[in-house]
Amino acid sequence: MKRVLLLLLTLSLLALRADEPVSKLNGAFRQVKNKFGTMTDWKPRDSVTVIKVFRDGYWLGAYYNDKRKGRRWFDGACGGTYALKNGKYEETVGYYSWDSTAVGKAYSFDYAISPKQYEQYGKMTSDKYKDYPINEVCDRITAAEPLKNNALEGVWFMQEGYWGGTSRFGEGNYKDFQVVKIFSYPMVVYAYYNPKTRQFDGAGGAMYQFDGKTLTETNEFWSWQPDGSRKGNVESFKMTLENGRFVQEGWSGKLREVYAKAN
């Protein structure tokens, strides 16, 4: 009888480990060391800022503040969805600025998560990156103050967008585009991409605070000004939330975006 109980307990623990809630990874992380490609030793990540943000099954990564010779200040971004299954971190690529052939592919990684760090070990493959090792250790990004109102926390997709002039979400250059916005305190990140053509348009990220009415963003990166001149800018937006949607307004009336919550 004891053996049966022990077996049942073991199976229960394995089942729990096999399919864990995606919220286990929620948070924002900054890479502190890596071992990519043909590297034989771990290298501190001190010449470029690399972040990875998780929230409720969605992820976004970005490289910016790049001090490496011959590189732009904003180097690129990627993202998609993820799941935790069979003890692995499984991610599917929805956009990838360095190589569009990675879009749609799924990769499985060993991982470890703690209150202070996220670790990831495995390989990816695409036309540009063949059987490419990706091993990284990231520190959790902590907030300077508590979040005042958590109503924005989660993943959102743009339904309407207007930025002044003739630009409209879903029309012209933005026809068939998706825009995802991820709030995972203390960061908010977002990306513009076309899932049909695998085109990546751009991404942005900021440290944020929300009091229930006003969203305040302190810019970290904004790919549409890839020289980094926008970093540190503080912007405030009027926010209206209702029935699983929010309206964001700013830029002296030039910006109006409507988002609906994912899932």
Outline where the language-model segments fall.
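A surface-exposed loop-and-adjacent beta-strand signature within N-terminal beta-sandwich domains
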Residues: 84, 88-90
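A generic structural signal for ordered secondary structure
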Residues: 6, 79-81
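Lipid interaction determinants
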Residues: 18-77, 90-203, 211, 216-263
